[in-house]
């Protein structure tokens, strides 16, 4: 919708320098707090546990402590996926230092999770990656990325319209996780003949 500028109210909005009136060009770090997760030895990550561990590409295992107590947006900082934007689907999780944790800065609290996730997916973080053998995104490079921020009213309307969808996604992802665990427990027993249907 941004390319065609077909946002709610676009018919009555003036376009100034290619940007709708009331929208602003800003650096990502002026809108969001962006910090690395914490280092965690792979020896401490288990296949089951209480808190999911988020690495560069999503959940990589479990750990007995959380370092993040809210659902957040992540930006992958290491590997081929550097610059990819992800979202945690758990309120309590451990975020490794292979990702940046993104939360709204003071004054931008209205940039809630559903908006932040979709908004940052449109930012070109891959353009500022460094490293030849292993691509990476650094604190210095990520802060050079500029974005066009819609006006507060439009962001609030977006968040209001999508927050229920986000809750539904979380609910279904948890069901998928539980069903996957059940499948992984039952399938070997069915194949070995330990249980029959």
What are these regions (language model features)?
Residues 4-39, 44-55, 148, 152-190, ...:
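Non-catalytic DNA-recognition/assembly elements of restriction-modification systems
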